[in-house]
């Protein structure tokens, strides 16, 4: 069997090596000529998978190591009889880590506490639901909006988008990109909704770039500059709007879900689906292959100030400022589009909060709840 894999997918050799010969290519270099003689294709979101790519090829199975599938023509795959799998939820915890690191940075810069804030989560799927679960331990009020789920499940606790935007001090977008239909999400935040945001609102988009009208957001910021904005996803990636880039508070190149833990989970999920497709046993397990984190434990004394302790643990695992500064260096050296892709391709090793164990000598000031809310493993010690 011949297997073509995006070069940035971790553990591909370990999981798929037993199946046959593996070829690795950059995601944007995977074209019709490259896939023609392949049996199995494993990609990320930067590779468009459709008839133009696969027509006339030997490909029998396509896996994308991502949650989203908007880069894949699912109708074509069904019609062509080509098996398919994505990796739902694989990097959800990584995205939540990104959001919490960003919120902590803004809270420190602006001098506010997350406790007592009203946070609106738009899109309550794998990412949004996990973000809500973690925030539950932080004494914040979570407002939830997910019209498809509200309709399917009869959820009366879900708000309409406009009701959420009217009340939320912090708005987090975690929706898929849906371009048509009753629940279309393209430009979900359009010019009218962006203009209606209260001054001082924090807007975080770590879902899909086109869910926010980037031009309208740029115009609001140019006109008033009265929002705090975190963008990890953008319209027209990688050729994003440089004027908008200059105006937002935290700008990163679609890396919120790029923890090595999330990537490895994605590889495992696609491997398992491929084994089912070809009627083979899935012998490899992620637990056998995952590397140990370089930082295993932090010990905090009873005198640790809660906010400083939370900040220390968060930044020990993941400091969003690292990505902000590194992306800025890349885009200044290479240009926006090339730098965007290059940083994603060369992204440094990052572990999730759950890989770090925090040992507390005393649960002072609700620190344990805050740390567990952020996703750390916490142990109380009497020693």
From Swiss-Prot:
Homodimer. It comes from the Bacteria. Keywords: Cytoplasm, NAD, Oxidoreductase, Pyridoxine biosynthesis. Transmembrane segments: none annotated. The keyword NAD applies. Substrate binds at residues 45, 66. This is Erythronate-4-phosphate dehydrogenase. It is found in: Cytoplasm. It catalyses: 4-phospho-D-erythronate + NAD(+) = (R)-3-hydroxy-2-oxo-4-phosphooxybutanoate + NADH + H(+). Disulfide bonds: none annotated. Pfam families: 2-Hacid_dh, 2-Hacid_dh_C, DUF3410. HAMAP family: PdxB (MF_01825). Belongs to the D-isomer specific 2-hydroxyacid dehydrogenase family. PdxB subfamily. InterPro entries: D-isomer_2-hydroxyacid_DH, D-isomer_2_OHA_DH_cat_dom, D-isomer_DH_NAD-bd, Erythronate-4-P_DHase, Erythronate-4-P_DHase_dimer, NAD(P)-bd_dom_sf, PdxB_dimer_sf. One of its GO terms (molecular function) is NAD binding. NAD(+) binds at residues 146, 175, 232, 257. Pathway: Cofactor biosynthesis; pyridoxine 5'-phosphate biosynthesis; pyridoxine 5'-phosphate from D-erythrose 4-phosphate: step 2/5. Coiled coil: none annotated. Its EC number is 1.1.1.290. One of its GO terms (biological process) is pyridoxine biosynthetic process.
């Amino acid at each position: 069997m011949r297997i073509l894999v995006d070069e940035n997918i971790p553990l591909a050799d370990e999981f798929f090596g037993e199946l046959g010969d593996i070829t690795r290519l950059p995601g944007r270099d995977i074209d019709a000529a490259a896939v023609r003689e392949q049996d199995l294709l494993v990609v990320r979101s930067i590779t468009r998978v459709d008839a133009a790519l696969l027509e006339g090829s030997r490909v029998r199975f396509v896996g994308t190591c991502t949650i989203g599938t908007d880069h894949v023509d699912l109708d074509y795959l069904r019609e062509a009889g080509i098996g398919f799998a994505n990796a739902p939820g694989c990097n959800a915890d990584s995205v939540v880590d990104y959001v919490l690191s960003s919120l902590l940075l803004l809270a420190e810069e602006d001098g506010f506490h997350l406790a007592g804030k009203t946070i609106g989560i738009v899109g309550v799927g794998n990412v949004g639901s996990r973000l809500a679960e973690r925030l539950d331990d932080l004494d914040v009020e979570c407002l939830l909006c997910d019209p498809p789920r509200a309709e399917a499940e009869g959820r009366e606790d879900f708000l309409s988008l406009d009701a959420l935007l009217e009340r939320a001090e912090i708005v987090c977008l975690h929706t898929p990109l849906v371009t048509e239909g009753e629940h279309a999400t393209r430009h979900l935040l359009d010019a009218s909704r962006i203009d209606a945001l209260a001054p001082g609102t924090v807007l975080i988009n770590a879902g899909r770039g086109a869910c926010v009208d980037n031009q309208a957001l740029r115009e609001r910021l140019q006109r008033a500059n009265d929002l705090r904005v975190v963008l990890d996803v953008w319209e027209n990636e990688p050729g994003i709007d440089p004027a908008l880039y200059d105006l937002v508070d935290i700008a990163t190149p679609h890396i919120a879900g790029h923890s090595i833990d999330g990537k490895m989970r994605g590889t495992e999920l696609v491997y398992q689906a491929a084994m089912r497709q070809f009627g083979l046993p899935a012998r490899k397990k992620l637990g056998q292959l995952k590397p140990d984190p370089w930082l295993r434990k932090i010990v905090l004394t009873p005198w640790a100030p809660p906010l400083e302790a939370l900040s220390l643990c968060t930044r020990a695992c993941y400091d969003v400022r690292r990505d902000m500064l590194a992306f800025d260096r890349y885009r200044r050296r290479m240009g926006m589009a090339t730098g965007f892709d290059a940083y994603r391709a060369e992204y440094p090793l990052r572990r999730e909060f759950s890989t770090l164990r925090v040992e507390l000598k005393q649960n002072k000031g609700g620190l344990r709840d805050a740390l567990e809310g952020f996703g750390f493993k916490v142990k109380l010690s009497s020693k």
